[in-house]
Amino acid sequence: MSGAYDESAMSDETTDSFWEVGNYKRTVKRIEDGHRLCNDMMSCIQERAKIEKAYSQQLTDWSKRWRQLVERGPQYGTLERAWLAVMTEAEKVSELHQEVKNNLLNEDLEKVKNWQKDAYHKQMMGGFKETKEADEGFRKAQKPWAKKLKELETAKKTYHMACKEEKIASAREANSKGEASVTTDQQKKLQEKVDKCKNDVQKAKEKYEKSLDELNKCTPQYMENMEVVFDQCQQFEEKRLNFLREVLLDTKRHLNLTESQSYATVYRELERTIVSASAQEDLKWFSSVHGPGMHMNWPQFEEFNPDLSHAISKKEKVKRNHDGVTLTQVTHGAEHGTPQTGDRGSVSSYEKNQQYSAEWSDDEQPPTAAQSASETNGGNPFEEDSKGVRVRALYDYEGQEQDELTFKAGDELTKLEDEDEQGWCKGRLDSGQLGLYPANYVEPV
């Protein structure tokens, strides 16, 4: 404050009241706190937006992974469609949470940022214009009353000191009457001292009472002036409180997906797809595609035709890839109009659209060592170590054919070749056995 009065020149018996000199500073500080609270609100919204973004990405990754697993797996028909609908739900909910993130950042956070910029004006020397105006308003309102208060404190102190001096003088004068060593002249001087002190006490008391009366007279005006400035601060704070309340309501509206029509539609569609799954329909489909309902070209008597002698028999259609793994190309017709699935790798021994050899023979034997050697050009199969990649099994797998590997979840093996178009990889167990396994049954070590 100015040199007219000193805030420290107050009685030790002060209270925590707003009306005490300097206690208006808490109201001024509230303005600065309001600016900081706007920053806190923006940080809060920003952190929630990061959570929404992360959750959205997790849903997308989860959906992508499991859609691939289900599509490659042995599940079929309407139940497969229902299962995949759960992935569709995740994708749509992911989009909704991404939208939540965008609304939080582009609407709620920006709204607080713009309001804060309009409400608080920084000064070149630091602080805010609103804080300075409030502080100066309180100082001006308090200055006359604080000056009178300082005069009152001085008068009070003088009065109390005079009372103390009068008490000491009276005690000395009373004690001197019982002492023979005190002369009459000394006794007279002590009495005069007492009289003077009493006179000083009376004067100090009158001045003290006058100062108190003057302070009381200016107190109503002091209170009125202080309340005017305080009300201005209250109005400013009211705007901030109402604004942040509005922001919180907007934030709630953006976060509450249960109020979103799009969110409700996602789960209506999911339920409709799941409910539409039919075991009977799936069983009928499987029977017609892979069971007794399949078309069959039953053997019939055929006359010899020399023009067809060059035709390739079914057995000659069997091809061998460079691994020595037999793949057949027997294709079933669609006479019954049954739907055909795409060529996708399987996560089980049964594949969608898996093709099996149409030939069998009592003479079939496992390939001999000589045959294996010829298929590898006489090379050592273990020489492939240098290009192998170590992988770990995610699930148990029981090989269904001689050229398939068998392993347990957690086992490690070496991947020798990347996934082929049917979703299989060539690998080698630590025992040295070579064979095929489903690509999505393992992960890199």
From Swiss-Prot:
This is Protein kinase C and casein kinase substrate in neurons protein 1. It comes from Danio rerio. Residues 338-358, 368-379 have a biased composition (Polar residues). The F-BAR domain mediates membrane-binding and membrane tubulation. It is found in: Cytoplasm; Cytoplasm, Cytosol; Cell membrane; Cell projection. GO terms for biological process: actin filament organization; auditory receptor cell stereocilium organization; cilium assembly; cytoskeleton organization; endocytosis; neuron projection morphogenesis; plasma membrane tubulation; positive regulation of dendrite development. Disulfide bonds: none annotated. It is a peripheral membrane protein. One of its GO terms (molecular function) is phospholipid binding. SUPFAM superfamilies: BAR/IMD domain-like, SH3-domain. Residues 146-167, 183-219 form a coiled coil. Residues 327-390 are annotated as: Disordered. It comes from the Eukaryota. Residues 12-282 form the F-BAR domain. Residues 386-445 form the SH3 domain. The keyword Metal-binding does not apply. One of its GO terms (cellular component) is cytoplasm. Binds to membranes via its F-BAR domain and mediates membrane tubulation. Plays a role in cellular transport processes by recruiting dynamins to membranes. Plays a role in the reorganization of the actin cytoskeleton and in neuron morphogenesis via its interaction with cobl, and by recruiting cobl to the cell cortex. Plays a role in the regulation of neurite formation, neurite branching and the regulation of neurite length. Required for normal synaptic vesicle endocytosis; this process retrieves previously released neurotransmitters to accommodate multiple cycles of neurotransmission. PROSITE patterns: F_BAR (PS51741), SH3 (PS50002). Interacts with cobl. Keywords: Cell membrane, Cell projection, Coiled coil, Cytoplasm, Cytoplasmic vesicle, Endocytosis, Lipid-binding, Membrane, SH3 domain, Synapse, Synaptosome. InterPro entries: AH/BAR_dom_sf (IPR027267), F_BAR (IPR031160), FCH_dom (IPR001060), PACSIN1/PACSIN2_SH3 (IPR035743), PACSIN1_F-BAR (IPR037454), SH3-like_dom_sf (IPR036028), SH3_domain (IPR001452). Its main location: cytoplasm. The keyword Membrane applies.
